[in-house]
């Protein structure tokens, strides 16, 4: 019955599909699902509409990038980490130390550009003994 219809091209709700299978003889009346009799005896007040377009259907999906995510991506692009990140470790990772230091530098130098802040953070971490490779 529905071999030519994919799930993306739905042929109707599940009730109409099961009803079609029963009428076509593909599903025995005795083998019908438990919910079928309940649905027949008390159908929904409004018919189910499976082809509803939501309010924001045509709007593109917004990119959500937090400042920390962009900074972490730039850090890993500049310094490719060869060491594994241990999730259960109590020590903060080098990238997290970089981000924390970046926030401190940014609070001290509010007028600096992102590239200048990145370079100042590199210098400050090198002065503190954290080697960035």
From Swiss-Prot:
Any Gene Ontology biological process: translation
Pfam families tied to this protein: MRP-S23
Locations listed in the record: Mitochondrion
Signal peptide feature range: none
Disulfide bridge partners, by residue number: none
Record's GO cellular component terms: mitochondrial small ribosomal subunit; mitochondrion
CDD domains: At1g26750
Keywords recorded for this protein, A-Z: Mitochondrion, Ribonucleoprotein, Ribosomal protein
GO MF annotation terms: structural constituent of ribosome
Family, as annotated: Belongs to the mitochondrion-specific ribosomal protein mS23 family.
Quaternary context: Component of the mitochondrial ribosome small subunit (28S) which comprises a 12S rRNA and about 30 distinct proteins.
Protein name as annotated: Small ribosomal subunit protein mS23
Source organism of this protein record: Caenorhabditis elegans
């Amino acid at each position: 019955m529905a071999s030519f219809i994919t799930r993306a091209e739905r042929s109707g709700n599940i009730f109409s599909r099961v009803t079609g299978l029963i009428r076509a003889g593909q599903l025995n009346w005795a083998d019908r699902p438990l919910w079928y009799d309940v649905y027949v005896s008390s159908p929904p007040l409004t018919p189910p509409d499976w082809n509803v377009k939501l309010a924001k259907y045509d709007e593109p999906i917004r990119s959500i990038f937090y400042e920390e995510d962009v900074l972490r991506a730039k850090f890993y692009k500049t310094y490719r980490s060869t060491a594994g990140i241990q999730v259960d470790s109590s020590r903060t990772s080098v990238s997290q130390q970089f981000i924390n230091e970046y926030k401190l530098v940014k609070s001290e130098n509010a007028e600096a550009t992102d590239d200048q802040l990145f370079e100042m953070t590199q210098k400050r971490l090198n002065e503190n003994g954290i080697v960035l490779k």
